[in-house]
């Protein structure tokens, strides 16, 4: 079997448009929605930024100091209720984990509510997603959310008494 030549690969790579990427996003969402026999009452989605190491000199792979490598940093959204893949957004390697995630959430909720107007939605993510744009979109679309918080002196000071109460209540 012959492999594609470099010019063929270049033409293929450059033929991909924003429109085709959006159509691909819709294929995954359409399949997810169609996988349900009845409208779900509640769905929980996990947000994850995944470090994808580069092997060579691909476009938009950049150095990411946290991961100590050249990479892409795609956002992956999966459904915690059935382990299905729901959405993927390819982002450049030096992106912040939450880059444009608010737009992805808004689009996802809009599509879900079009299919199931009464579905309750819950998003979960680590502390990288605990940024103002994410809180804003979750509040605007009236969805539940659980985002981690990075430990800081202020957070520890403000939660110290609550932690002590919880320890006493559990008899630890």
Tell where the protein language model's regions lie, with residue ranges.
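Active-site-proximal, Lys/Arg-enriched surface segment
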Residues: 2, 6-76
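Conserved, mostly hydrophobic/aromatic
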Residues: 48, 83, 126
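Short coil/turn connectors at secondary-structure junctions
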Residues: 39-42, 72, 82-84, 118-119, ...
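Gly-rich Lys/Arg/Thr-decorated short loops/hinges at beta-loop-alpha junctions or inter-strand turns
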Residues: 80-93
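An internal, acidic/charged active-site-proximal segment
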Residues: 90-172
């Amino acid at each position: 079997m012959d492999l594609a030549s470099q010019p063929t690969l270049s033409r293929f790579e450059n033929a991909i448009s924003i429109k085709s990427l959006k159509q691909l996003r819709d294929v995954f969402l359409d399949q997810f929605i169609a996988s349900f026999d009845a409208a779900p009452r509640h769905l929980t989605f996990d947000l994850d930024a995944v470090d994808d190491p580069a092997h060579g000199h691909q476009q938009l792979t950049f150095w990411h100091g946290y991961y100590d490598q050249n990479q892409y940093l795609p956002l992956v959204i999966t459904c915690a209720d059935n382990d299905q893949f729901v959405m993927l957004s390819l982002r450049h390697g030096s992106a912040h984990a939450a880059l444009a995630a608010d737009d992805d959430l808004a689009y996802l909720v809009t599509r879900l509510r079009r299919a199931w107007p009464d579905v309750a939605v819950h998003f979960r993510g680590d502390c990288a997603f605990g940024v103002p744009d994410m809180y804003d979109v979750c509040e605007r679309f009236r969805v539940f959310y659980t985002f981690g918080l990075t430990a800081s002196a202020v957070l520890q000071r403000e939660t110290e008494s609550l932690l002590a109460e919880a320890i006493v209540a559990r008899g630890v």
